[in-house]
Amino acid sequence: MSLALVYSRALSGMNAPLVEVEAHLANGLPHFNIVGLPDTEVKESRDRVRAAIIQSGFDFPAKKITVNLAPADLPKESGRFDLPIALGILAASGQINPEKLAQYEFAGELALSGLLRPVRGALAMAWQGMQAGRSFVLPQENAEQAAVMRGIAVYGARSLGEVAAHLNGIEPLTQTECKLPRRPSEQSKIPDLADVKGQHTARLALEIAAAGGHSLLMMGPPGTGKSMLSQRLPGILPPLTEDELVEVWALRSLLPNHQQQLDSNRPFRSPHHSASSAAMVGGGSDPRPGEISLAHHGVLFLDELPEFDRKVLEVLREPLENGEIHISRAARQAVYPAKFQLVAAMNPCPCGYLGHPSKPCRCTSESIARYRSKISGPLLDRIDLTIEVPSLSAAELMQQEAGESSAAVLERVTAARKIQYGRQGKVNAELSVSELDGKARIQKEAQEALGAMLEKLSLSARSFHRIMRVARTLADLAGEEEVNKTHVMKAIGFRRAL
């Protein structure tokens, strides 16, 4: 047989389109050519494949070898096609059984010794390949990642020789099994909310944000506990569901670091304020996920919010509304999920001490206005909760009584989320405008109070709907079916800090 077909997958954002690797051997001067819009890394695989085949004890055919990666208009990158190319050549030259090739999809980079090295996007490939009905053969390091997908068989191999022995029926590979962790990793120590003294309003806002999935902005002088509170938010969020786990791990598998710990911790990303737009939303010639996508189903914490470049902050507007980000480059486009919970912290002025009870502010009114203008109105309009975090007095700091623990708050948050999922199948922050009208259940008195405050404060329609979502969360935390006037007034109070 001089022609062989092997299945593999490329990466395009979270998608993994099917690639058919065709290997053809013909008489003529020995030559090895790869066609089908391969990247530089793929072209370099010729030398890796030749050395790996020889080092694995096989004969490299002294013929004219043509490898086609179809479809030709799909860009191909990285060394993931090394293994399928090598198997195609071995099958076309009659050194392995070609009949079993159609049952599997292959991916893996080859070392010169024939050993297999891990590749990016193993879980994303398995996620996309479930409907094809084929099994996967991957490097051992990638197999545990891909095996979390239910309903698909994944086999891990350490070398080209092991894969060939499996296909020839000499020594079958063992199917890889991976059990989904049901609890957050004990190795990751999430700080406890009991460490925070005082700040009852901020603690309540944090609980509301956790219960309804709302975004939160905290403003206050340096050292008042804004960052401390934010770092404790993951500790009062319920563990990831199984579907959420798969999405989070699929995104992690796209990173260059292939060895990712598989746990059910919600992501917590805290990029530095010098981060670029590409670092925040993703990008590059081969688009990779950015911080907002790596925070998918978790928390994105932006400390010193006005210090971020305004262009970087403005790119948050689309994902805050839609829960995904579209990246367009000259030759490639990618869509990544970005359903994150935004938590931000900032000082009230450049020096940080505006309104401080003992330290005077050194800023002019112009510098304060310029400082706050770095955060645009449309972005602020998309933040559900905005609170002030005041400095504590000496007596409050010296008190020995610990605050309420994260475990106690988590119980209330879990109960509120259970109500929301039972009523609408999602958290309140994700309710659309049409869903909000049917699910909010606002009392007539509360509607009248809300309408009066909207006119008085000149709030936008977006603010109106976000206030309704927060009020619905307050009612869920209280275990009440209807939103009353108290819930509405509290929700309005959480939007008046700026």
Residue positions per predicted region:
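Peripheral, non-AAA+ core regions of ATP-driven protein-machinery
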Residues: 1-217, 221-224, 328, 463-464, ...
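Basic, amphipathic alpha-helical bundle interface domains used for macromolecular binding and assembly
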Residues: 38-46, 61, 68-78, 286-287, ...
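Short loop/turn elements that form and flank the Walker-type P-loop nucleotide-binding site
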Residues: 60-63, 100-101, 131, 150, ...
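Residues immediately C-terminal
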Residues: 112, 300-301, 307-308, 394
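Conserved alpha-helical scaffold flanking the Walker A/P-loop in AAA+ ATPase domains
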Residues: 207, 261-262, 267, 278-300
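Walker A/P-loop
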Residues: 218-257
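Clamp-loader machinery-focused feature within the broader ASCE/P-loop NTPase space
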Residues: 243, 247-280
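Walker B catalytic acidic pair
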Residues: 297, 303-304, 315
